[in-house]
């Protein structure tokens, strides 16, 4: 297992640094025999490039080929697809961060949970009721238990005992703007972190937040990209002080967070955002930092690949410097890497292995820096 020791990660008695990537659709592709080879290709090509951790969805709530068809009921074929993903990662010595829900409607998420609640007759008025309604929380807990205690049909290993899984993630990018005080989301994080740890006390646990500072640290609100983000119901410091949380998680998306397109300003923001969170993870929280997502979209022509690579270099440089100085451990996961044949899933952020030699060279250089 990968373990925490202060601000550092360790595995098999050696320091472990995350040099990772996101490919969120692995389970969905594995559920279809026609697209399953893309799963193997994604993991194999990433491993060949020297990457060691993949963050992916372990949820799909309602809709087409859902893992969770309705509360308390799961599609065994899709569960076996997730088994395949985990087994392929194991075969290629790739660790996984498995996210258990989504703040957004993609693949169901909290909106689908609330729809299920309304269909069951609950008086719900907002998607944010996901975080407070007892029945909705029971749906989520049941799903978490089903995943964490799952026995893999390929490896015959229980997920909670499998070292292939580096960490569980409670929810991707949670926000609760209906309660900008942060109390609602904080209570949910504390409850769910305790619940996950009661089932699986061994694996590491992260929240999945973007890293916005909240009302517990008003002096840090100016670090946020805009005024709204300080009222999204999240709080980087307070959220990560919840018992059971092992890793400080942040995302970095200056291309969508900042309204302008002045490239130098974006890189300055990234520098400040990274430096502040690394400082706080090390000195206020005492835990490693995981940049769970970072990237730049080249879809609308606002930015090109040259800027994307400058952006990546900035993220890697700042983390590497802090790690070399012994300040922090953890690592960074690019959003996102694809094999050929999956281009139709590109949201503008995808780096296609076979079509991105300069980006692969950048990834290789970061690996060399981590190893030297």
Curated annotation (Swiss-Prot):
Enzyme Commission number, as recorded: 3.2.1.78
PROSITE patterns: GLYCOSYL_HYDROL_F5
Biological process terms in GO annotation: polysaccharide catabolic process
Active-site residues, record numbering mapped to chain: 173, 293
Catalytic class of the enzyme: hydrolase
A GO term, aspect molecular function: mannan endo-1,4-beta-mannosidase activity
Keyword list, A-Z: Glycosidase, Hydrolase
Residues binding substrate: 57, 172, 253, 335
InterPro entries, A to Z: Glyco_hydro_5, Glyco_hydro_5_CS, Glycoside_hydrolase_SF, MAN-like
Domain of life of the native organism: Eukaryota
Tissue expression per record: Expressed in stems and leaves and seeds.
Reaction catalysed by this enzyme: Random hydrolysis of (1->4)-beta-D-mannosidic linkages in mannans, galactomannans and glucomannans
Family membership noted in the UniProt record: Belongs to the glycosyl hydrolase 5 (cellulase A) family.
Protein name, as recorded: Mannan endo-1,4-beta-mannosidase 8
Originating species: Oryza sativa subsp. japonica
């Amino acid at each position: 297992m990968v373990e925490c020791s202060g601000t550092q990660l360790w595995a098999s008695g050696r320091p472990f640094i995350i040099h990772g990537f996101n490919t969120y659709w692995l389970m969905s592709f594995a559920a279809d025999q026609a697209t399953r080879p893309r799963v193997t290709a994604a993991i194999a090509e990433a491993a060949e490039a020297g990457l060691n951790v993949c963050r992916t969805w372990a949820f799909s709530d309602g809709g087409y080929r859902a893992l969770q068809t309705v509360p308390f009921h799961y599609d065994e074929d899709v569960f076996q697809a997730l088994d395949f993903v985990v087994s392929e990662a194991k075969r290629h010595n790739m660790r996984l961060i498995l996210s258990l829900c989504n703040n957004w409607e993609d693949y169901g998420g909290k909106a689908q949970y609330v729809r299920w609640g309304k269909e069951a007759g609950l008086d719900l008025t907002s998607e944010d009721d996901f975080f407070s309604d007892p029945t909705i929380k029971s749906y989520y807990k049941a799903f978490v238990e089903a995943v964490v205690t799952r026995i893999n049909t390929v490896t015959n290993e229980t997920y909670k005992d499998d070292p292939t899984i580096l960490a569980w993630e409670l929810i991707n990018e949670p926000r609760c703007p209906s309660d900008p005080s942060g109390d609602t989301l904080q209570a949910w994080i504390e409850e769910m972190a305790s619940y996950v740890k009661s089932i699986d006390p061994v694996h590491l646990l992260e929240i999945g937040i973007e890293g916005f500072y909240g009302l517990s640290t008003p002096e840090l609100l100016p670090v946020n990209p805009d005024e709204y983000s300080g009222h999204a119901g999240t709080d980087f410091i307070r959220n990560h002080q919840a018992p059971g949380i092992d890793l400080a998680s942040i995302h970095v998306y200056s291309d969508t967070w900042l309204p302008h397109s002045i490239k130098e300003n974006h890189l300055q923001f990234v520098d400040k955002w990274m430096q502040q969170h690394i400082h706080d993870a090390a000195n206020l929280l005492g835990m490693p930092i995981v940049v769970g997502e970072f990237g730049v979209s080249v879809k609308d022509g606002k930015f090109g690949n040259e800027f994307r690579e400058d952006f990546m270099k900035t993220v890697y440089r700042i983390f590497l410097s802090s790690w070399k100085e012994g300040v922090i451990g953890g690592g960074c996961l690019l959003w996102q890497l694809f094999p050929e044949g999956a281009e139709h899933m590109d949201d503008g952020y995808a780096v296609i292995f076979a079509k991105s030699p300069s980006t692969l060279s950048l990834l290789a250089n970061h690996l060399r820096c981590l190893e030297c």
